[in-house]
């Protein structure tokens, strides 16, 4: 494990915290043989318990926090393993909803994960509210007309769902306030009222930027 330990120490030497992108990679990685299709791939498994113990040890030695980006296809039990070692996960406001566009109430957010409005791979909160991500996908031909219409109908329900979740705290958000600026401000305060031990507000959402930094699945067109 020397290379892994040296990598951790090199990073901790210059920062008080470390964010591990796709932390699921400590447990398994989907690999595809050269020239093959994704259907020919398989999971390559790693000694996750040993890696997490080393990660916890080095973070303690350097008095640093560790964040694990646990979004996407998360192996069963991994989040429990992370929380047992005080490694924070990540919860994204736009993702914290069920299929009925019911957003997670403020007091139901976990205390084992960082809370944030969005990420560089997702629309900004302002862009999400104005459907800019849908605009881009339609403009680039990544979705057909039927999918676009369904997406926009669903987004309208999501906006109503977020609006309702924010309005449950009358001191935070007034029911009649529907402008994007009010939603941005209320969303930031909402996350601050959760149990999350750390809240991250991306600069794009702090400034109300409309366009997202990266549109996954595109190269040179966004």
Question: Where do the language-model regions lie?
Answer:
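Catalytic cores of glycan-processing enzymes that make or break glycosidic bonds
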Residues: 1-222
